[in-house]
Amino acid sequence: MSANSHPPNSKNVLCNAAAGAAAGVVAATFVCPLDVIKTRFQVHGLPKLGDANIKGSLIVGSLEQIFKREGMRGLYRGLSPTVMALLSNWAIYFTMYDQLKSFLCSNDHKLSVGANVLAASGAGAATTIATNPLWVVKTRLQTQGMRVGIVPYKSTFSALRRIAYEEGIRGLYSGLVPALAGISHVAIQFPTYEMIKVYLAKKGDKSVDNLNARDVAVASSIAKIFASTLTYPHEVVRARLQEQGHHSEKRYSGVRDCIKKVFEKDGFPGFYRGCATNLLRTTPAAVITFTSFEMVHRFLVTHIPSEQSSIL
């Protein structure tokens, strides 16, 4: 994945989709416990760690508390939909992103910053619409240990069926508006990532496609921290809207009402609730995702025969 674009073909589509899916699975498995904590912080606010046996930071204390109450299963609650969501998310995203870059590039195959932002935004919109139901299920599964008096969901597919039956399409696509607002995240992250890669390539006197894993890790971590810090508030709003279900008290009537109530209760810091945990989770996840994608993609490009050679 480079700032320059390559002509689209079935090999590129296959390599992008397969590498994106592999990267999503690896990242989801690695960061799931921190994702559970982040989601609960966003939805229910900071926990009260009154147990004298719980020591250390809020994050460590929350991990210990969840493990004590719900076991290892609690730390990996929602792993299945997280894997499914991230697998499909990155498979769709990297494929769409590459196709849109090819469509928007100039005659000399160069991509302007504006075109890069547009490609990232378009891929983000398509991915968000396609995967929103899985993110709703993930949020519900990760927080259902804290919801009293509600029959828990048994699995990802049973949750999808039940939400569709009880709440209809609105339930499956709850939180879609703030999720689409989150397109600004990838619109910032991916062009920033591309620009940092170009800078590192020039500094190391090599091509972007020949950057090593360390360079990719540096570029992806800086881009992720920058984009996450600027766009985090929409994640809080999205998580709160997705968490409230058919059987729970309807706390928010919509995006505007949610923003108003969060601000009234917690002020501006309320929109950054769980941000530190989120950065601890998303920065390594971004490094894992982008490094895995780049390495797997290079392997596939090298080993999968091109259309012309397969015909011959």
From Swiss-Prot:
Inhibited by pyridoxal 5'-phosphate, bathophenanthroline, tannic acid, mersalyl, mercuric chloride, p-hydroxymercuribenzoate, p-hydroxymercuribenzoate sulfonate, bromocresol purple and N-ethylmaleimide. Its main location: plastid. Pfam families: Mito_carr. Highly expressed in young leaf mesophyll cells, root tips and at the branches of adventitious roots. Low expression in all flower tissues and not detected in siliques and seeds. GO terms for cellular component: chloroplast membrane; mitochondrion. Keywords: Antiport, Chloroplast, Membrane, Plastid, Repeat, Transmembrane, Transmembrane helix, Transport. It is a multi-pass membrane protein. It is found in: Plastid, Chloroplast membrane. InterPro entries: Mit_carrier, Mitochondrial_sb/sol_carrier, Mt_carrier_dom_sf, SLC25A32-like. Solcar repeats lie at residues 11-103, 111-199, 211-299. Mediates the NAD(+) import into chloroplast. Favors the NAD(+)(in)/ADP or AMP(out) antiport exchange, but is also able to catalyze a low unidirectional transport (uniport) of NAD(+). Belongs to the mitochondrial carrier (TC 2.A.29) family. This is Nicotinamide adenine dinucleotide transporter 1, chloroplastic. It comes from Arabidopsis thaliana.
